[in-house]
Structures are given as C-alpha cells and as structure tokens.
C-alpha cells in the first residue's frame, strides 16, 4: 500500500473555510487516506485538519488592524513555512486571503511544492498587471466567476472557472407567501427589502440614507412595507446606535438570519454593494445598489479601479442590469426615485429578474468542477499515485 496523499491548506475567512471544506470533502472521497495540515476554521477541523492556527486569526480587515496583529500573523506564517520544509506536502492549497496566501504560495513554489489557489484576486477590478506576478507563484487557479480565467490567458497559469458556491446556498427555507405571513405582510401589498451592509463602516455610511429613502417611499406609498435584513456580523447595538431617533417610528421590520427568506418575499431591494448583491441576484430580486466610502478612499480608488461597474451582477453580465448609485448619487431622493420606478413598472422589474436569472445560470458549476479539476491536477501534474 502506498503512502497517503498529504495536503497543506490555508484559509482565513468563514467563506474560505466553507469553500475549503467543500473541496476537501470531495477530495477525501477520491483519496480516502488523505492527510491535511495547516490553517482552517471549524468545518476544516471537522474534516480532520491538523490545525496550526485558527482561521479567525487571519480574518483581519484594515491597515491598522493588520499592523496591530502583525507579530502574530508573522508567527503563524513562519510556523507553517517551517512545517512545509520539514513535512513537504504533495501540494499546497490556499483559499482566498490573497495577501497571506500568495506569499505562502511563493515560498512553497521555491521549495518545489505544487501550489493551488482557490478564489482569484480581483485583477479584473484593479491592478490587472498583477495577473503575471500571481501566475508566477501558482500552478493552478480555481475561479468563482466565468470571466476571470481570461485575465490569466497569457501568463502560462492554468486557470479554471469552477462555479460559485452561493448558487447552491441561495435557497429560501420558506415560500414567498409563508415568508410574508411571518412578516405580517399581505400578498397584495408591496415589500421593499433593505440590506445596509455587513460591516460597521457600511452601516455608519448607509443606514441613515437607506432609512430616509424608506421614509420618502412611505410618504408616497403608505401601503408599502419594509424589511431590514440585519447581517450576522452587525450587533443590535451597532445597528441602533446609528439609527436616527427621528426615524424609529418608521414601519420597518428588522430580521436576522436567512436573508434568502426575506428577499424571496420582497418586490424590490435597496442594497449596499458587496456579496449581498450576488445573493439577491441568485434569488432574482430587482434591486438598486448603493456605494459610499470615505471621499479620499473613493478618489484613490477611481485611479486604481478600471471596471465600469461596482456591483457583482453588473460585473458578471458586463452590462448595466441593476442601477448603481455611488457617493453623492446615493442619496434618499435618487434612491427612492429608482425604487419607485421598479415598483411602478412591473415589466422593467420582470426584465431585470430575467437578466438576473441569466447571471445565476452563468455561475452554475461546470461538469468539471473544483474537485474534478484538483483531482486531475493531483494525478496528472503532481504525479501522486494512490496506494489504495
């Protein structure tokens, strides 16, 4: 009997842990004696990961936060590198977390260890020239969006679109009528969902704007209902400390948990730019997208970011499916007008739903998904031969 396959893995976000677990679970069916060590979250640990650090320790956003945690991050990096040297794996799989992951991949490549990265850095949004540098660190790249592999076409890197995992996850637990009954909204009434973001900075910049938009809509259409979908990452205190006192009497229902249930019950959505726009697209909910950041950040971003669009549905379709309102244009007057258009013009809303359905179809995993691509890579490029 030959030796078991040995894989080192790095993941640092909850979403990355989910992706890694799905991939490793599939690989274990093909290589049942597989051994894994590295950095991961609870799902990876359940699959037998010999964990050297918790993924949460690498889930840091912001320059100041990274600087504060840098000694610990460096310790984790050096410990994993030392183990790669003492117990060389058959391959290293890194998932998202590009700053940490790609540095580790570069070191692994220097050690002669084959490298696989899951989730392409956003070279399509800014610094597309990075693609060549990224390619020099990797042997295989797994992409979530169908337009991403072409950015690596002239780099020599094998890049594959493998489908987006949210397609399988974006399934409501309730029917539209069941969700409306829970919310106390009649079948005849119209419901507008509000998703102001999953980060505290987004809540601080967008919540009041979104609530004042709802206020303007309600004054024009008193039969409207509103449901604000509170992200799991936002506490009640964080939400209500920026909720203006003057707007506490608005008929806005606040709900936590499965966003898909409340989206499926809604007729339109006002949403902060981010993953939530993709979740809404997969449900097929007509939406207006808002984006606000620090003015200096925006000016810098304008110089770096080359994409015409900010929302994922538009980026994937490469056309203006949904309305995007940025910075000063993301104001209650404009946003309420955009939403009224969606609510008053069912044919336009239906056309948007159809365009979003096409977006969803484009994200379905191909027959040769992540597990198949990596398995082929292990057998044909790494040269591993199962021993039984």
From Swiss-Prot:
Keywords: Glycosyltransferase, Lipid A biosynthesis, Lipid biosynthesis, Lipid metabolism, Transferase. One of its GO terms (cellular component) is membrane. It catalyses: a lipid X + a UDP-2-N,3-O-bis[(3R)-3-hydroxyacyl]-alpha-D-glucosamine = a lipid A disaccharide + UDP + H(+). GO terms for biological process: lipid A biosynthetic process. It is an enzyme of class 2 (transferase). It comes from Magnetococcus marinus (strain ATCC BAA-1437 / JCM 17883 / MC-1). Pfam families: LpxB (PF02684). HAMAP family: LpxB (MF_00392). Its EC number is 2.4.1.182. This is Lipid-A-disaccharide synthase. It comes from the Bacteria. Pathway: Bacterial outer membrane biogenesis; LPS lipid A biosynthesis.
């Amino acid at each position: 009997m030959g030796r078991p396959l040995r894989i080192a893995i790095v993941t640092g976000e909850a979403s990355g842990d989910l992706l890694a677990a799905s991939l490793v679970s599939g690989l274990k069916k093909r290589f049942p004696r597989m051994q894994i060590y590295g950095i991961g979250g609870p799902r990876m640990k359940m699959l037998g990961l010999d964990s050297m650090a918790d993924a949460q320790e690498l889930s840091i956003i912001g320059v100041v936060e990274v600087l504060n945690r840098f000694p610990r991050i460096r310790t984790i990096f050096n410990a994993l590198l030392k183990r790669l040297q003492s117990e060389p794996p058959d391959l290293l799989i890194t998932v998202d977390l590009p700053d940490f992951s790609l540095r580790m991949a570069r070191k692994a490549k220097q050690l002669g260890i084959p490298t696989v990265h899951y989730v392409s850095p956003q070279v399509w949004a800014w610094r597309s020239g990075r693609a060549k540098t990224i390619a020099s660190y990797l042997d295989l790249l797994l992409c979530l969006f169908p337009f991403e592999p072409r950015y690596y076409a002239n780099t020599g890197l094998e890049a594959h679109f493998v489908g987006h995992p949210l397609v399988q996850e974006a399934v409501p637990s309730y029917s539209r009528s069941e969700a409306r009954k829970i919310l106390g909204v009649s079948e005849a009434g119209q419901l507008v969902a509000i998703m102001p973001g999953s980060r505290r900075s987004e809540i601080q910049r967008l919540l009041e704007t979104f609530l004042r938009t709802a206020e303007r809509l309600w004054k024009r259409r008193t039969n409207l209902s509103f449901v604000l979908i509170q992200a799991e990452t936002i506490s009640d205190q964080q939400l209500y400390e920026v909720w203006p006192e003057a707007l506490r009497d608005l008929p806005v229902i606040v709900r936590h948990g499965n966003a898909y249930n409340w989206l499926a019950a809604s007729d339109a959505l006002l949403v902060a730019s981010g993953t939530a726009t993709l979740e809404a697209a997969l449900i097929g909910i007509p939406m207006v997208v808002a984006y606000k950041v620090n003015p200096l950040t925006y000016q810098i971003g304008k110089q770096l970011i080359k994409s015409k669009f900010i929302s994922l549905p538009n980026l994937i379709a490469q056309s203006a499916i949904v309305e995007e309102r940025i910075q000063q244009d993301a104001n209650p007057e404009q946003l309420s007008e955009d939403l009224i258009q969606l609510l008053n013009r069912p044919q336009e809303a239906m056309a948007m739903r159809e365009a979003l359905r096409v977006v969803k179809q484009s994200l379905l995993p191909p027959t040769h998904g992540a597990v198949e691509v990596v398995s082929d890579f292990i057998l044909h490029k790494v040269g591993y031969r199962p021993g039984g």
